[in-house]
Amino acid sequence: TVLRSLKGNIKLNGKIRFGMISIGVNNIFNSHNSYKSIIDIDGDLIFNGKVDFNTGIVLKIFKTGAIEFDGRNSIGRFSQIISKKNIHFGYCCRCSWNLYISDTDFHFVKFKNIIHNNVKPISIGNNCWIANNVSISKGVTIPNNTIVASNSYVNKTFEQEYTLLAGIPAKIKINDVARVFDVEEEAYWNKYYGWM
């Protein structure tokens, strides 16, 4: 892990315990930790609970930016999270590999002689599952209990919970759906279907 800058603030809220923040976590999809992560904090990085970062991640927080994790979060390998304003991950929000999320476009664009703000906050709700190769752009709100399918681009706010978002750009594809996060329930279904 490369600590490029720690000029900002790292805030640990709640009960602090060993393993609360893990960087370079190995799992079945990432069996070695030779990929370096880059941590560049000039703004605020806020932890309200446990967060696991796989290898090869980039966290870039500009002086005016903030990234906040509510706990039971995981960020998959090769993910990039970049903030100039505010990015908030709700409780038990899990993200697979190659996530790209940025609350800025970095460059200004003139459209019909008007230059709009290129920075807007992002909020991801509780109990969300963001699959691999997903991009989330500025100004997006993803509600609680949402699944975002692989290879999707989320560029607008959604309000309805218990949906599957998919596509470029992402649209609601299925209603009344949610990922199972409970370990015991998942073990039951693995056994039920003969996977254990």
Report each predicted region and the residues it spans.
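Gly/Pro- and small hydrophobic-enriched strand-loop and loop-to-helix capping segments
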Residues: 155-167
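Domain-scale signature associated with acetyltransferase and cell-envelope carbohydrate enzymes
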Residues: 1-102, 125-127, 134, 144, ...
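Glycine-rich NAD(P)-binding loop of Rossmann-like domains
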Residues: 114-125
